[in-house]
Amino acid sequence: MSSHPPIRSYVLRQGYFSNAQRHAYESLLPRYGIPLTEEPVDLDSIFGRTAPGILEIGSGMGETTAEIARQHPEKDFIAIEVHAPGIGSLLGQIEKHRLTNLRIIPHDAKLVLQQMFTSESLDGIHIFFPDPWPKARHHKRRLIQPDFVSLLCDRLKPGGYLHIATDWEDYATHILHVLRSEERFVNTAVDYAARPAYRPLTKFEQRGMKLGHTIRDIIFTRTA
C-alpha cells in the first residue's frame, strides 16, 4: 500500500465567511447535511420518497444547485462541497426556498462516492466549472481523470448521465479525451452539447461570456 497521501483536486481556501453563512452552517447543517459514513446512503429514506437521484460535485456558493432543485421538485439532489462559506450559502438557500429535495454532504467527493454510493445508484451527476488547474505541473490535480471517471460511470445507472461544464478550453479537450476513453460512456453530441435548459447561467458565466469566454457543456450517458 502506498504511503503517499491522495492527490486532491481542491485546496481548502477558506475565503470570506460571512456571519450569515456561518450562522447557516452552524444551525442548518445538522438538519440538511448528511454525515460521511462507510455505509451506502439510502436516498429513499433521506427524502421520504422514491425519485431520480442527482449528485452535484462542487456546488460552489450554491446558487445554481438551489435553482436547479427549485425548478425540478420531482428529482432529489445531493450536493458535495468542502468549502465552509459555500456550504453555509447553500444551506441558507435551502432554508429560504424551503427545498425538501436537496441535501449536502460536506466531504471529499472521491471518498463519498467510494463509501456512500453503490454501483448503478444515481440517475445523473453534475460537475459545473471544476478547478481547471491550468499550470501543466498541476494537471495531476484535475478532478477529471480516468480512474475517477470510471468511478463516476460505475455509480450511474445505465441510461444515467454525466454533465460537466467548463470555460477552460484546454480542460474541455482533456475532459472529452478522458470520457471518450471510458467504454461505458457515449457522447450525446459530436463534441460539445448545447447548454440544457435545466442549467441556469451563473453570474460567473455571464461575466465570462461578456469577456468572450466560451462555455462548453459536455454530456455523456452510460450505455451499460
From Swiss-Prot:
Catalytic residues of the enzyme: 131
Pathway the protein acts in: tRNA modification; N(7)-methylguanine-tRNA biosynthesis
Any Pfam family: Methyltransf_4
HAMAP family per record: tRNA_methyltr_TrmB
Keyword Transmembrane among UniProt keywords: no
Record's keyword annotation contains S-adenosyl-L-methionine: yes
One Gene Ontology cellular component: tRNA methyltransferase complex
Positions of S-adenosyl-L-methionine binding: 56, 81, 108, 131
One Gene Ontology MF term: tRNA (guanine(46)-N7)-methyltransferase activity
Protein name: tRNA (guanine-N(7)-)-methyltransferase
Record family assignment: Belongs to the class I-like SAM-binding methyltransferase superfamily. TrmB family.
InterPro entries xrefs: SAM-dependent_MTases_sf (IPR029063), tRNA_(Gua-N-7)_MeTrfase_Trmb (IPR003358), tRNA_methyltr_TrmB_bact (IPR055361)
Entry function: Catalyzes the formation of N(7)-methylguanine at position 46 (m7G46) in tRNA.
Organism listed in the record: Nitrosomonas europaea (strain ATCC 19718 / CIP 103999 / KCTC 2705 / NBRC 14298)
CDD domains reported for this sequence: AdoMet_MTases
Keywords attached to this entry: Methyltransferase, S-adenosyl-L-methionine, Transferase, tRNA processing
Sites where the protein binds substrate: 135, 167, 202-205
Enzyme Commission numbers on file: 2.1.1.33
Catalytic activity: guanosine(46) in tRNA + S-adenosyl-L-methionine = N(7)-methylguanosine(46) in tRNA + S-adenosyl-L-homocysteine
